[in-house]
Amino acid sequence: MNNLKKNDKEVLEEFANLFPILLNEIKKELEKIDFPKESIHWIETVIKANSTGGKMNRGISVLESLESLNEGRALTRHEIFQAQTLGWCVEIFQACYLVSDDIMDQSLKRRGKPCWYKQKRPNSDQEVGLAAINDSFIIESCVFILLEKYFKNESYYLNIVELFHKTGFQTQLGQLLDLTTQPIRGDFSSINLKNHTRITEYKTAYYSFFFPVALAMLMSKINHEQAFTTAKDILLPMGVYFQVQDDFLDCYGSPEVFGKIGRDIEENKCSWMICQAILNGTPDQINLLKKHYGFDNPTDVEIVKKIYKEINLEKIFKDYENTSYNFLIDKIKTTCIYLPPSVFLKILSKIYKRDK
């Protein structure tokens, strides 16, 4: 039994130490089918490069949520291992979408390093390039190798496999919305908070917030529909709040701290920042934004950021952050009938006023 309460650093280290073991299991499965060594090395490199280096909040949330859901008793070593393994499945699952998202957005950096498609191929000076598309498929498939190996005999196996498929589909729908609601330059008719919220819920909130907690609930054999509804009602707004932070940091965050170079302005994104600028700007400012938003050159970007400063979007964001935090705290206190509030408070404490 695990009776000693670990601090955050110890939890992170223990979680990180499991990754090489799981990666080796994937390698062994590939060796069983006599796959070429060079190709196995490629797959190992792909998974390691894209699954590690982040904050690992989503993965660790599975274990932390399981602990909160089972307050009053210590988890067994087996339960801890299973939760950590599921957590890594979440992190690896996320990696496949980061790889494809960076290609579609033509991003340059991810977690402080060049995006995978911009990196050198294993044992080559050539860029990975569009081979990264297939790599994203492979990363996703490797998740199901791990799920089958470690959870096939669990009573909740089918439920977690279905949840992975459903979450993947929701994320893909979110990416579709993100790509197809990008307006024609100068046309702001589709840039509004309603569209922003819809994109965010599907692209970010489900897999980053609801997904890890729902996995812990399935491990705990919670099957009350209202419990899952409550979790969704709290975690989707939390995911929207998280994305708004991301949109703010995309513009104002330090690339060294944030881990990537923001490109929402250049890519004509339906970002919270431009939505607020349209709501709070003067007609002249909005006309200027229509002329300069969505163009990939420094002069246009600088003009957009200058207008953001004139509108004082930093203050608008800080007010939003405080309002959202209070809203979420109140929602947790008033709706947590079937689930302990600590499940959600722990997650909220990690993202409140974050800078990366």
UniProtKB/Swiss-Prot annotation:
Known cofactor(s): Mg(2+)
InterPro entries: FPS1-like (IPR039702), Isoprenoid_synthase_dom_sf (IPR008949), Polyprenyl_synt (IPR000092), Polyprenyl_synt_CS (IPR033749)
The keyword Ribonucleoprotein is assigned to this record: no
EC nos: 2.5.1.10, 2.5.1.1
Entry note: cofactor: Binds 2 Mg(2+) ions per subunit.
Ligand binding (isopentenyl diphosphate): K55, R58, Q94, R111
Biological processes per GO annotation: cholesterol biosynthetic process; farnesyl diphosphate biosynthetic process; geranyl diphosphate biosynthetic process
Amino acids binding dimethylallyl diphosphate: R110, K203, T204, Q243, K260, K269
Localization, UniProt: Cytoplasm
Ways its activity is controlled: Inhibited by aminobisphosphonate drugs (aBP), such as risedronate and alendronate.
Cellular component GO terms held in the UniProt record: cytoplasm
Pathway terms, separated by semicolons: Isoprenoid biosynthesis; farnesyl diphosphate biosynthesis; farnesyl diphosphate from geranyl diphosphate and isopentenyl diphosphate: step 1/1; Isoprenoid biosynthesis; geranyl diphosphate biosynthesis; geranyl diphosphate from dimethylallyl diphosphate and isopentenyl diphosphate: step 1/1
Reaction equations catalysed: isopentenyl diphosphate + dimethylallyl diphosphate = (2E)-geranyl diphosphate + diphosphate; isopentenyl diphosphate + (2E)-geranyl diphosphate = (2E,6E)-farnesyl diphosphate + diphosphate
Residue sites binding Mg(2+) 1 per the record: D101, D105
Binding-site list for Mg(2+) 2: D101, D105
Any GO MF annotation of the entry: (2E,6E)-farnesyl diphosphate synthase activity
Top-level EC class: transferase
CDD domains: Trans_IPPS_HT
Record keywords: Cholesterol biosynthesis, Cholesterol metabolism, Cytoplasm, Isoprene biosynthesis, Lipid biosynthesis, Lipid metabolism, Magnesium, Metal-binding, Steroid biosynthesis, Steroid metabolism, Sterol biosynthesis, Sterol metabolism, Transferase
Family: Belongs to the FPP/GGPP synthase family.
Function: Key enzyme in isoprenoid biosynthesis which catalyzes the formation of farnesyl diphosphate (FPP), a sterol precursor.
Name of this chain's protein: Probable farnesyl diphosphate synthase DDB_G0278823
Organism of derivation: Dictyostelium discoideum (Social amoeba)
